[in-house]
Amino acid sequence: MGAQDQNGKNHGGLFRDFQNRNVKKMWPLVMPITIILLVMIFMISSYSRVKKVTVSGNEIVSDQQIKAFSPVKKGTSLFAVWGKTDKLAQSLKQRSRRMQSVKMKLVNFNQVKIKVEEYPTIGYLFVHGGYQPILKSGVIIKGKVLNPKAGFPVLKKFQNPKKLRRTIKQYRRISPPVRAVMNTISFSPTKSNPDRIFIQMSDGNKVYASISTFGDKMDYYPSISSKLKVKSVINLEVGAYSYPIPQKQTSTKTTSVQGY
């Protein structure tokens, strides 16, 4: 009886050894097949694709436009997104000149979050009965609006593209508080100064300046206007001086502007 039990144990041990040896031999084959099967199951599942795309930070460009421009959409394979979010964000940024920066990241495993920063509007160009926004980058948006926002000047009478670009370049140098009190900037050349511009201020003062220098000189405007007792014409073409705006039966007295 004891011999039979011993033989049974020996047979059981040999069988287990046989199983272990076979498992060890087959493991190098089973492991890759298992991985391949898991990958295939993942690829055909909904978890392998972008579930949702959200947009934030935009004010002018709509969510719908950004999603349409984006190379990543709902249903895009995650294999096309992993490790490529910076490149994809840069591709999206190039689709609209209004976008100053774009950041893209994956959240909650398969959701894409797009954060946009837009170039702000700093003025408008009047053209053919409409107003084209001028961005902080200097770019003029071709799409026109009928009612420009208050607090931004309108550029008028600029037929020469080069002079317009120079004017915008100088205008961008002016501090935002001064920009906010500029109503219009009109190209107003003379024989003696082919680069002269005329600026109508919201406080009623009028300014004449040169394209090449008004970007720096206009920042002195608050100091100059604070010394004026009446609405005046301020000339910043050469130096700085002012005189009251001419009215009927009123003599025009030239006043030197101090502090510039």
Swiss-Prot record:
Protein name: Cell division protein DivIB
Main localization (coarse): membrane
Species for this entry: Lentilactobacillus buchneri (strain NRRL B-30929)
Known role: Cell division protein that may be involved in stabilizing or promoting the assembly of the division complex.
Subcellular location(s) per record: Cell membrane
Membrane topology: Single-pass type II membrane protein
Positions on the Cytoplasmic side per record topology: 1-25
GO CC terms, sorted: cell division site; plasma membrane
Keywords: Cell cycle, Cell division, Cell membrane, Membrane, Transmembrane, Transmembrane helix
